[in-house]
Amino acid sequence: MKRKLSWMCAAVIGLSAFPAFITAAAPATPPLINAEPTEPAQSPATQAPVVAQTTPSREVKLTFAQIAPPPGSMALRGVNPNGGIEFGMRSDEVASKAVLNLEYTPSPSLLPVQSQLKVYLNDELMGVLPVTKEQLGKKTLAQVPINPLFITDFNRVRLEFVGHYRDVCENPASSTLWLDIGRNSVLDLTYNMLAVNNDLSHFPVPFFDPRDNRPVTLPIVFADMPDLAQQQAASIVASWFGSRAGWRGQRFPVLYNHLPDRNAIVFATNDRRPDFLRDHPAVNAPVIEMMSHPDNPYVKLLVVFGRDDKDLLQAAKGIAQGNILFRGSSVVVNDVKPLLARKPYDAPNWVRTDRPVTFGELKTYEEQLQSSGLEPAPINVSLNLPPDLYLLRSNGIDMDLNYRYTSPPTKDSSRLDISLNNQFLQAFSLNSTQETNRLLLRLPVLQGLLDGKTDVSIPALKLGAMNQLRFDFRYMNPMPGGSVDNCITFQPVPNHVVIGDDSTIDFSKYYHFIAMPDLRAFANAGFPFSRMADLSDTLAVMPKSPTEAQMETLLNTVGAIGGQTGFPAINLAITDDSAQIADKDADLLIIGAIPGKLKDDKRIDLLVQATQSWVKTPMRQTAFPSIMPDEADRAADAQSTVTASGPMAAVVGFQSPFNDQRSVIALLADSPRGYQLLNDAVNDSGKRAAMFGSVAVIRESGVHSLRVGDIYYVGHLPWFERLWYALANHPVLLAVLAALSVVLLAWVLWRLLRILSRRRLDPDHE
């Protein structure tokens, strides 16, 4: 019903606008020169339909800096004339108006009128912007109306550059053929909300919509201050939504007995429920119900009901592991029974480390491993690895690469470049031998494709927790050209390249060992908690009376870990009793304040209180997170105590005093504004990237990290690997030991040879 209404609205828009859109396209195409603002040409194609005027609407500005490939600007050239942006539309909304505001600069060498910029939406031509003489070499503003009839769940705006710099004998690869699209270009959209039925068969829509590229903001509502079981249930739900949000990011504002004005999750029992549910009938089982907001029928609430806290936990696990069975306005979660225990390092978002992994398993969309064009776009593969993978003495990571490509017409310098994290690794020539062409013609692939199979050794020290493997197929394409009297013309044909799904990469031969504390591992991969994807080795320590801000910090943190692992925290344990932390073999996640049993520990390098805080600073601070200073530079040089009224937060890591293989991560703040800074940092990928070492201080100015104090090691290495690791930072000692070993070995051999010589000369001598 919802989708039918969406199409009905779109049809009304399109049918009323289509004739006027054709006639209005011409006056809308002349761009603005030198960024002089003018009112956009109005046409019925870009007006909200009458049917949508009484429904709630929202206006969205999508800048190219936000949604275009980094850095947001585009350089369209003769051999690579296409650029584009992508955006989605929520299933509970319909677009009623769309305008593309372009900022671009054409090359001064272009021929006016013959050169132009074509704008497509989902391969439908929306408008043409001819390049005029006045625009050459100057920044130009133009507005192109977009017919909302063509806006669907997933959309692509494609910009095609048609460039000419001479009348005859052009070279498409000429450096004078270019048009730059500015990162300040904006797509203005107006969305109208659709009334959605209370039907859980679409779950998690509308609470999370995969078509929406924005960070997920999902308020969590409690009747009052939640107890430990309710905190655990909310953590399970938040981590599951975080696992679905993934790269988008997530935030979970917490409200006590107060409803937000947007879609939200509500936790309630028969005895403890928000005021708006006072008249709701009592339940006799764990129930998940979708209902409308009492003040706004366009806003939906997912109410997690239960007779008691035990029911809430069961319902939360039902959301995380049984939602594929949801339908109707409510469901009863009868049972959630685990069948297999999770294993270390089995997070779904991490590359497997127990066997070789195929590239087909690493794909995130169907055509990721192929590309086409005169200059095929790079093929990218993401590798998310456990941050404690020990690669120090590795000769490289084995990768068995199978690839196919269009044969170069001649033997030239066409090649395949392989890069890791923007660092060049290796190049391979693209062959054009006749034997290979004949062999491949017998294979069930596109005619004219060559096949290559290459073993690549990846320098292991370049790998981190999040990695990008890139394959660039670079062709030396023959181009038309010449002079007016001797012109060579032909039609260039696109090249096709494919990385085989059966290509493999192998991380199964490596140990798990890491130097701690390492806040970069926590910020980028949720480590050490994410070692077990279900957080079964994690104990969260909360205040006895958590505030809304402290609860939000807990939910944001477990949501971020869920986004990094791809699995909900169904076995997370939570306590507010500091006496229990010494008895549990677990990594500790502390929210709010460090318990008294840990506060006086010498391992702590920073402490944040209401108005007073102190910090230890190292002898010498490194400027780069990847550089590990030696022990003398890490030593605490001074301890400073400051009293201030401004907000501050911090993330502190140190070794657990109860188990030398366990770690403590404390998220601290001195005020409500401090918790806001802390939550902003947890949800901001740029601020998380600034966290490293043992201390990250968060202020209004940003995040500042320190690597101070002793380090400890988590994981296991065989004795010989541990010996090499210990000697790696002491080359002089290693040289002395090597020399002594050589002398000792020579002496042993000398003694052995003397004994053998005596026996040979005197057989009777014992």
Where are these regions (language model features)?
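Solvent-exposed alpha-helical segments and adjacent loops
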Residues: 26-766
